[in-house]
Amino acid sequence: MSLRALLARLIDERRAETPLSSDDDEPEVRLAIYDSPLSEPQVVSVRGDDFHALVGETAARTYAVSRERGGRVPYGVIREIVENLIHAYFRNATVTVLDDGNAIRISDQGPGIADKVRALQPGFSTATAQMRRIIRGVGSGLPLAKEQLQFLGGTLQIEDNLERGTVVTLSVHRDPPTANTAPARVAERRHLTT
C-alpha cells in the first residue's frame, strides 16, 4: 500500500478536520536549516509515497545536516520522532535544525498530543490498527528517544504547535559531558537501597 493511500485511510479513520490538500500531492517533510539565528533558513523538501523511504530519507538528511554542523543528536532519536509524524498524517511536517545541529525541532499540524506526560512513558500510544501495520505502535518511540537524549545530557520537549499539532524539540549540549560527571553517576549507582 502506498503512503498516500495509507494516509487517506488514516484520515478517514480519524475523521480529520482538514484532509490532505490533494490526492495528487505526495506527503512532504520540509527541512529548515539555520546557519545562525539571524539568517534565513535553507529549505529542503523531502517527498515520497513510501512511508519507510520518506522517514528514512528525512531522518538521514536531518542527521547528516546536524552532524555537518557539529551536532550530537543520535540518528535513532531523530528517526523515532520523524516516524511519529504518521500520527499527524505528515500534515505540514517541518524539521528545523538549529544551534549548530544540537537542537532539532520537529513540528506538524496533526491532532496533537493531549497528555504529554503519559506520551513520554512506555506503553501509551495513539497508533491505530492501520498505523500498526507499518510502525511498532506500542508507545516506545518517545520514551526511548527521551532516555537516549538524557544519557547524553540532553532533553526532549513536547509542546503544542500554534494552532494545532505538536512540536518536539530534541537538544543536546554542544560539548559532551565531561569525565568528571561520570564517576559521580557511577558512585550513586553503587548505593542501591531496596
Predicted regions mapped to residue ranges:
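Generic detection of short hydrophobic beta-strand segments and adjacent strand-loop junctions
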Residues: 36, 40-46
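General secondary-structure edge motif
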Residues: 42, 57, 61, 65, ...
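Conserved short strand/loop->alpha-helix "switch" segment adjacent to the catalytic nucleotide/phosphoryl-transfer site
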Residues: 45-81
